[in-house]
Amino acid sequence: MCGIFAYMNYRVPKTRKEIFETLIRGLQRLEYRGYDSAGVAIDGNNHEVKERHIHLVKKKGKVKALDEELYKQDSMDLKVEFETHFGIAHTRWATHGVPNVVNSHPQRSDKDNEFVVIHNGIITNYKDLRKFLESKGYEFESETDTETIAKLIKYVFDNRETEDITFSTLVERVIQQLEGAFALVFKSIHYPGEAVATRRGSPLLIGVRSKYKLSTEQIPVLYRTCTIENVKNICKTRLKRLDSSTCLHAVGDKAVEFFFASDASAIIEHTNRVIFLEDDDIAAVADGKLSIHRVKRSASDDPSRAIQTLQMELQQIMKGNFSAFMQKEIFEQPESVFNTMRGRVNFETNTVLLGGLKDHLKEIRRCRRLIVIGCGTSYHAAVATRQVLEELTELPVMVELASDFLDRNTPVFRDDVCFFISQSGETADTLLALRYCKDRGALTVGITNTVGSSISRETDCGVHINAGPEIGVASTKAYTSQFISLVMFGLMMSEDRISLQTRRQEIIRGLRSLPELIKEVLSLDEKIHDLALELYTQRSLLVMGRGYNYATCLEGALKIKEITYMHSEGILAGELKHGPLALVDKQMPVIMVIMKDPCFAKCQNALQQVTARQGRPIILCSKDDTESSKFAYKTIELPHTVDCLQGILSVIPLQLLSFHLAVLRGYDVDFPRNLAKSVTVE
């Protein structure tokens, strides 16, 4: 995930070297988010405030390489002191364009660096904006979506209706043209000593530090009275006059520092006093005064933004509070699941809209069959949702491993709709299966976590799961987001089915409560760690279930294989008597997933067979399930949700168990041997 860090010192004298060090330290605190290049933008050699130019330094690779590059800049005097200065810094995780210096951030508006911007997120309509700007004579040098933002603000500035237009007004007009998710921080030679930041769908917070009293603890949110529909329209209205009652500043126009970051870990060493921006907030700092405004007012808007105190210690923030990316990603699932649904599920009207599919919805509804194709964890997400897709779409659903699908030369027809699931969007077998289906005239749908990937480009339409970059090789949050994306597709397909409305409403209510239920499951981490202490010396492990939880068993067993190097097998409980029962004895650890769903009675039969062979089952069950717990060696009790979503809650204990087993066995959780995050060869 891209990392944003920016630093403004107002009436706080700092040398260029000190500013560099602050920016680099901020980026180092964001390294755990993952990145492939880094860059900074600072004021040029002339220290007169009104005559500055912007100097960019960017480097592919680690922040350390950028740090070394900064000190090679012969044209910059590191001893020059700035009383007021604004510097921005960025770590980039490539989404549009390969990792290189040109594609790195900050991105610039032109060769004179009139405007520079750093960006975390994805602009989905950047191609249309780029085409428009190119038609106006603006030349692009990178492949990024972010450069479109830099060029767009230059276009708005060049076509301004008045010379006294404010920096925040320019940004306001720009973001009204943007679609997608973003956190943005802008710097400009036309507005020296000023900063503007905004966000929509990506996190951004502002830290404030001053040894003087601050003007307020609650920053009022200001509004304009008009809305600009496109970049050519002119808004005649103005914001309320900025004064001590509408801005945050040090009383008496004294010294103050502001820190902008996508993560609190980059700020905490400087201050624990922060303001969390909300979606569509525009925060501007000018003359040491911070103001926040929004374009549109809604009834649910909070009228102010409070300064909050971070409850965090510096030593906690390496890789956030986590020892490994995988652990971090497991604990991010309340947020990643919410992000997958955000803007797509309307819980008030019980409607679902997947914007990437809406133009093809009629064609999809006319199809005769759905084919869902993936590898590894992505395949398991397809298995997990097959039953609910069949129920909601009333269509036959085939779930295929991409390699096997190709080996069989599976018949595919023009009235099929084929889904291709891949976290990276580059999985070789899945990509080959996509091309195979396209050649046969099927409609193709991509479900990926990477905008601009091969699968997202080559499919006819698709769903971006919005889970955020997943760095750990063993997939966790991508699985649950893929799961939810497929469920949302089924809900969208069944919207006009009167007979399914009660079921749809039940599932949508379940989706709404999922983030909180996931937090409840994550609170079992200590209990699962204690279980891992008993199991980590074992050589083999069986995971059994059926119905909606069969995929949970497959995925849980895969996680254990991937990072603990223990043999583990996910078994359909209905197949127990057809071979696997021979493995059961008092030494073999057996995990059983038994939930209060239509398969409950059949799972009880399997449980009896295991205990009859002196097996000691570890049971994942519902909180109110006293029947299963009677026969359990140990139980992990989970909150109950609608049956087709229970697999999201039941897989998380297995993710946590695999993590703790790997740590106890002394293995690198994030980089298991012989495995890569993105499998780009057959």
UniProtKB/Swiss-Prot annotation:
The modification Phosphoserine is found at S244. Residues 360-499, 531-672 form the SIS domain. InterPro entries: GATase_2_dom, GFAT, GFAT_N, GlmS/AgaS_SIS, GlmS/FrlB_SIS, Ntn_hydrolases_N, SIS_dom, SIS_dom_sf. Substrate binds at T377, S378, S422, Q423, S424, T427, H578. It comes from the Eukaryota. It catalyses: D-fructose 6-phosphate + L-glutamine = D-glucosamine 6-phosphate + L-glutamate. This is Glutamine--fructose-6-phosphate aminotransferase [isomerizing] 2.
